């Protein structure tokens, strides 16, 4: 998956939905259909990128979340897994959480390179502020995703810009042949950036919002001003702010702050992106899209119906047009060749000549609708369970003795230890009923 050679003329379009929300320690609401665009059949989404800030990070909550999935991750997996989305990766630093979900057919073409946390609170020692990053390869292209929470208050604009630079500086992925983050094909950067509206008073800002006169407010938005003066920040693009400022609201209402502080509304919650600069582009010219890799914004909006926080969530929907650098998976699993004997199921698979196999690779058996790679019902270590190997065709056996008789469909996934990713996935199939035991109460227990 390290080759940069274009592999065939056929292009591919991926639809990506990005969400940022400062949830102010609240539990998930009952319904996220609007935020996740679940009822919009025209979107046909491929990937969800979800960043949350200010998750409950009390000591009891953190200890519980270390042993189990946090309530937001569990809720999102429950919502998205029936739609064939699988949690690909996540990273959390105290109250800052980043999650990536993808349709299962894309898994063999997503390689997780690294996850990283950069604390900037308390002089860089505390993770209540800072950024978290997932660095991955998507169909052979380098993509970095950053969720951040920058310092608050209108007077801390310079500190926000310093933290922005600090987070970017610390996000370089470790490993051979991984380019500097600024040489990645795409950076998606979002979060509670906390930029405020300068100069204008509270009454003027609220009246402008009431009359939907946002143009004058854009000119005094601190992020918009900074982009005019900072060459690197200028390379990050953003959609037009055609929605009301997303902070600060009274909870469970659409009323801006009525407390004694009466904070001035601001567009604190933002979604930015940056495409790799092409050699022909100068430092002061817009970045032209590469002919084989381009990103377009389909929609950028806030979601005013949610009131659990003093922030409103923001989403951006993108179309990523790319010409895959990787056109075939590293592993091909062949359920049509599986057969059973006693309590075991034999699985055949083939690998590419350059696949870096490891004895610690494993093949998982999953029910269709899995939430993440740990939801297997059985598995086999490739190094321990391989029974034959010839002409690049391998066979392993998987224990199915604890799987009750069912008409459910299953999937096989091959997990590469060295690549830290699923590198092969089978089509759905059913296991012949005679191969499964009839006790409906038995369930396989994960061993890893």
From Swiss-Prot:
Main localization, broad class: endoplasmic reticulum
Effect annotated for changing residue 23 to M: In MDCCAID; decreased phosphatidylinositol-4,5-bisphosphate 5-phosphatase activity
Chain segments carrying region Catalytic: 16-318
Disease the record associates with this protein: Muscular dystrophy, congenital, with cataracts and impaired intellectual development: An autosomal recessive form of muscular dystrophy with onset in early childhood and characterized by progressive muscle weakness. Almost all patients also have early-onset cataracts and intellectual disability of varying severity. Some patients have seizures.
Family, as annotated: Belongs to the inositol 1,4,5-trisphosphate 5-phosphatase type II family.
Subunit structure, as described in the record: Interacts with GPR78; necessary for INPP5K localization at the endoplasmic reticulum. Interacts with PAK1; competes with GPR78.
Role, per record: Inositol 5-phosphatase which acts on inositol 1,4,5-trisphosphate, inositol 1,3,4,5-tetrakisphosphate, phosphatidylinositol 4,5-bisphosphate and phosphatidylinositol 3,4,5-trisphosphate. Has 6-fold higher affinity for phosphatidylinositol 4,5-bisphosphate than for inositol 1,4,5-trisphosphate. Negatively regulates assembly of the actin cytoskeleton. Controls insulin-dependent glucose uptake among inositol 3,4,5-trisphosphate phosphatases; therefore, is the specific regulator for insulin signaling in skeletal muscle.
Protein's UniProt name: Inositol polyphosphate 5-phosphatase K
Organism: Homo sapiens
């Amino acid at each position: 998956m390290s080759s940069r050679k274009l592999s065939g003329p056929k292009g591919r379009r991926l639809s990506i939905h990005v969400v940022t929300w400062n949830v102010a320690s609240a539990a998930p609401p009952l319904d996220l259909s609007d935020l996740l665009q679940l009822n919009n059949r025209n979107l046909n989404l491929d990937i969800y990128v979800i960043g949350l800030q200010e998750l409950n990070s009390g000591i009891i909550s953190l200890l519980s979340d270390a042993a189990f999935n946090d309530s937001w991750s569990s809720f999102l997996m429950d919502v998205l897994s029936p739609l064939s989305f699988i949690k690909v990766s996540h990273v959390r630093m105290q109250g800052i959480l980043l999650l990536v979900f993808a349709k299962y057919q894309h898994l063999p073409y997503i390689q997780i390179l690294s996850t990283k946390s950069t604390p900037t609170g308390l002089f860089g020692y505390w993770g209540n502020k800072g950024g978290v990053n997932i660095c991955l390869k998507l169909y052979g292209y380098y993509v970095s995703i950053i969720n951040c929470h920058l310092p608050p208050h209108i007077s801390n604009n310079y500190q926000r810009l310093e933290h922005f630079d600090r987070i970017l500086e610390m996000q370089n992925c470790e490993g051979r042949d991984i380019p500097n983050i600024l040489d990645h094909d795409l950076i998606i950067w979002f979060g509670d950036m906390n930029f405020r509206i300068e100069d204008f008073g509270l009454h003027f800002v609220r009246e402008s919002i009431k009359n939907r006169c946002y143009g004058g407010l854009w000119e005094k938005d601190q992020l918009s001003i900074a982009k005019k003066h900072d060459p690197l920040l200028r390379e990050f693009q953003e959609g037009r702010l055609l929605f009301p400022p997303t902070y600060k609201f009274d909870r469970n209402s659409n009323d801006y702050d009525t407390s004694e502080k009466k904070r001035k509304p601001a567009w604190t919650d933002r979604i930015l992106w940056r495409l790799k600069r092409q050699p022909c582009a100068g430092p002061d010219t817009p970045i032209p899209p590469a002919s084989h890799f381009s990103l377009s914004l389909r929609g950028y909006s806030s979601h005013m119906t949610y009131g659990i926080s003093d922030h409103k969530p923001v989403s951006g929907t993108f179309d990523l047009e790319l010409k895959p650098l990787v056109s075939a998976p590293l592993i091909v699993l062949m359920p049509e060749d599986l057969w059973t004997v006693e309590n075991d199921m034999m699985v055949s698979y083939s690998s590419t000549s350059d696949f870096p196999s490891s004895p610690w690779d494993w093949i998982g058996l999953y029910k269709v609708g899995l939430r993440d790679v740990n939801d297997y019902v059985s598995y086999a270590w490739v190094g321990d369970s391989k029974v034959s190997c010839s002409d690049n065709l391998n066979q392993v056996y998987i224990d199915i003795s604890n799987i009750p008789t069912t008409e459910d469909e299953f999937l096989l996934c091959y997990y590469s230890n060295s690549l830290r990713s699923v590198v092969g996935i089978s089509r759905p199939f059913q296991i012949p009923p005679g191969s499964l035991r009839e006790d409906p109460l038995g369930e396989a227990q994960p061993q890893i």
